Regions:
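Soluble extracytoplasmic domains of inner/organellar membrane proteins
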Residues: 58-59, 63-176
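Hydrophobic alpha-helical segments involved in membrane association or supramolecular assembly
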Residues: 5-6, 24-25, 29, 147
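Generic secondary-structure boundary/loop-capping signal
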Residues: 4, 39-41, 156
Length: 178
């Protein structure tokens, strides 16, 4: 059979990219499912006049999100998984790489995931600041399949909340020139 003939020419790089694509798909699906609840991660506290005074992050909601994503990833990333590589990549002919019908490869993945949150304030203009909460998912995976041994590291980030805080714009600015 053609696929068995070409399996010996599957490079470690091709196996690594196939595993990487599978992992990214799993991470994106886990994050999307966890975010479907529509939780609010940030609350802006305002003064009686309506001006922003403080920004509060809902740590309980972030911890629930973390637990949901990591739980889903633990279920989907470990064990026997099937990835697909283009048949042309099995021929050893550079011109055909990346083309052709998909040929399934079975990988025995062992993976671990870590999830962290980052919060930052960045300038968004004159007397404006942008508060952003970002989630970073990092996955380290290893395929112990005898024929398709590979190791890969994947990181992806998702912006969970972004709030622009607007203050009063000064009517006049003094510039010091040298």
């Amino acid at each position: 059979m053609f696929s068995e003939w070409g399996l010996g020419s599957v490079s470690e790089e091709l196996t690594q990219e196939a595993a990487r694509g599978y992992i990214l798909s799993c991470v994106n699906q886990a994050v999307e499912e966890a975010l479907e609840e529509g939780s609010t991660f940030v609350q802006v506290e305002r003064s009686e006049g309506g001006e922003p005074m403080a920004v509060h992050t809902d740590t309980a909601a972030l911890n629930r999100l973390r637990a949901q994503v990591l739980s889903k990833l633990e279920k989907t990333l470990n064990g026997s998984v099937t990835v697909k590589v283009p048949a042309g990549s099995l021929t050893g002919i550079a011109l055909l790489n990346g083309h052709g019908f998909p040929v399934p490869l079975t990988l025995r993945l062992e993976a671990s995931a870590d999830l962290s949150f980052h919060t930052e304030f960045v300038s968004a203009g004159i007397n404006q600041s942008c508060h952003r909460v970002t989630m970073l998912v990092a996955v380290q995976a290893y395929s112990q399949s005898k024929r398709f041994e590979t190791q890969t590291h994947v990181e992806t980030s998702t912006v969970l909340a972004e709030t622009v805080l607007v203050g009063d714009v000064p009517e006049m600015a003094l510039l010091e020139t040298g």
